[in-house]
Amino acid sequence: MNKVKIGEKYEVDITSMGHEGEGVGRIDGIAVFVKGALKGERVIVEIEEVHKNYLKGYTVKILEKSQHRVNPLCQYADRCGGCSLQHLSYKGQLEYKTQKVKDNLERIGKIYTKVHYAIGMENPLNYRNKGQFVVGEIGREKITGFYSFHSHEIVPVDNCLIQHPLSNKVVSVVKEWLNECDISVYDRKKGKGLIRHVVAKVAFKTGEVMAIIVINGEDIPCKEELIEALKEKVPGLKSVILNINTRRTKMILGNKNIVIYGKNTIEDFIKDLRFEISPLSFFQVNPIQTEILYDKAIEYAGLTGKEVVIDVYSGIGTISLFAAKKASFVYGIESVKEAVEDAEKNAQVNGVKNVKFIWGKAEREIAKLYKEGVKAEVVIVDPPRDGCDKEVIRAIVGINPKRIVYVSCNPSTLARDLRYLEDAGYRTVEVQPVDMFPYTYHVESVALVERM
């Protein structure tokens, strides 16, 4: 029986690191996950949570320090939930993420294959092209920032080091406007108040900026004052949008957008392809590493110009359009109608003719294409964090492609899905992690899977 109690302190050797970047050790044989500790350290831990098979705690004192421990660059690092690895050197982060992918593949999928060292960034700061800031209030002062780790407590952040400087500027202007006009902010417990979030999107290649004000209503007071302040202080401002979200939900954006200044999209490039980005568009948040990620995906696809490719979860068509350059024909399948419409526009803007985007459930559309005589040699999948639905994987296996390229943002669901593919007669040739999210525990990977 677990005799450890909340509030007790223990000396613990940290032998590994967990899924969210926490240190992992043992107390009387029970695993303890320690916030703020690193592999190789000996620390004093105070227990915060006691569960049947594991414990959670935080670092009170470091007795023996890791060679990879550094002082955080960010002043909010110990409170903000955005970055969990500010205290780990960048080399240490890349080693952790490489090992994380390897461990997940072996532990969950029983897959033993070549996992390459994670590809990192030369400058792992200011890399995000999208910032989503929550709005709150301390006393009478309106604040903007991020939630604390696993909490709905808002940490006020004036300058986020992983955001593009123009995103920080947008939020600074909006916060000033909120206070000057004394506009109500949303209270998630009561479901009342007007301003919920500020979302800033920045196109790295073109410098265009979109400011999105998420509101619990249909309009805002002092609208002209906001527009004028943003125009004056934000270089490259092309769009100011009200996003209507009146539901009591954790979702940041609602489905309705009202343009109050400029246009409804901004434009950016990935390599030489141009993309229109709308308020609801999914676009990889790290444009520098996205080029590396997509280059690796296309390399793994092994295209010679003769192949038919099916791109599953194709979004706004980014990977499909890159594949179309080297393939005979590409079919992109996506369940979100607006994303398909954006993808079609992007194909048109870039003059890409050998691609077709299909709106529908992937498992159904894959089977339909097969019945119509489409023989795909290569399938590319880029699913959300939950991984591929079982029906989708069955449908992919059912059309018997020679190669599958799996782009993953979650090593655990990647491991699960690769196990299914291996049981169905495929083998995982190699996996390349790419660090899309420096200073966080997230890691993207590309896996090459071939028919045996």
Swiss-Prot record:
The residue ranges of the TRAM domain are 3-61
Q: Which residues form the active site?
A: C409
Family statement drawn from the similarity comment of this UniProt entry: Belongs to the class I-like SAM-binding methyltransferase superfamily. RNA M5U methyltransferase family.
Does the record carry Phosphoprotein as a key word?
no
Residues recorded as binding [4Fe-4S] cluster, renumbered to this chain, are C74, C80, C83, C160
Organism name = Caldanaerobacter subterraneus subsp. tengcongensis (strain DSM 15242 / JCM 11007 / NBRC 100824 / MB4) (Thermoanaerobacter tengcongensis)
Q: Tell me its EC number(s), please.
A: 2.1.1.-
Pfam family of this protein, just one?
A: TRAM
Top-level taxon of origin: Bacteria
Is Ribonucleoprotein tagged as a keyword? no
- Give the UniProt record's GO annotations in the biological process aspect: rRNA base methylation
Q: What class of enzyme is it?
A: transferase
Residue sites binding S-adenosyl-L-methionine per the record: Q284, Y313, E334, D382
Record-given protein name:
Uncharacterized RNA methyltransferase TTE1812
Extract the coiled-coil ranges from the record.
none
What's in the keyword line of the UniProt record? 4Fe-4S, Iron, Iron-sulfur, Metal-binding, Methyltransferase, S-adenosyl-L-methionine, Transferase
Q: PANTHER family attached here? A: RNA M5U METHYLTRANSFERASE, TRNA (URACIL(54)-C(5))-METHYLTRANSFERASE
- CDD domains cross-referenced by the UniProt entry: AdoMet_MTases
**Gene Ontology molecular function, alphabetical:** 4 iron, 4 sulfur cluster binding; metal ion binding; rRNA (uridine-C5-)-methyltransferase activity
